[in-house]
Amino acid sequence: MKKYFFLMAAIVCCAITASAQDAQEDRNRTYRITLGNVQYAHHDEKMSAGEAVGKVLSGVLTGKTEVQATKYEEDVKNAIIKGLSSAHRYRYNDGLLQLDDIVEDGNLVADAVITNIQAKSDSRTWKDKDDKTQVTTTYKGIVEAMVTLKDAKTGEIVANPTFSGSGMGSSSYSDSDKAIRDAINRLSNRITEWLNKYCPLQANIIEGAAAKKDKQKEVYIDLGNSEGAYTGLHMGVYIVKTIAGREAKSQIGKLKIEAVEGDDISRCKVQSGGKDIKAAIDAGEQLLVISID
């Protein structure tokens, strides 16, 4: 009888361990993402001679011009692919797999409409030291796209974000090509950032490391090489509570991975919230760590 109870206890223990391991692996499960249709809204547009003259005259009068840069259509498509490929938890399907082979739960198909590929020029005149009139022209690139993300299994639209490769942080250049290529790179980065927020990496604080007085300086988290951790990754720290049967998260700090020390462990520097993080660890609070890059 004792042997029976010991055997049952061992089975239960193994089942609990396996379940915990499955949950650990499933929290950062990776998904496939496939690029479906890509359209350029201005693909078939052709400017008449009169329109071209009008653009030139407008530029002369105002010092500003705006022209669709249609020749960069393929570059923008490649930037969209790069953006989809660079996300933490998505693996880009490069066409080797048919759509029928990627219909597992969570996999996505992305259709894109490129709405704008534009170079804006701004000219100003000024006098040099010899009192000669000089003209300086600067260019700003703007690239915009709308991406429709659909569930690969059901075809249901799950998100419809719009991305822009310009904005307040965009740079001006003396060359239109450089301006547009900078905007294209920014577009790619925006797509990756959005996907990383939509489906972030998750971890738990497993131990407090260095501390000073009442502030936590370093912690260890259960995220390592096997789940895509890397040095420099920023992560938010959240207290998790259950309120009226619902999970509620409240951010109390921020971490930065200083060293990936194994398949499932990394050492992190506490960048903010050290006092609250230490208090939560000491109180045995449940802390969730979520990537914010």
Give the location of each predicted region:
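A short, hydrophobic beta-strand-centered structural micro-motif
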Residues: N28-Q39, Y90-T148
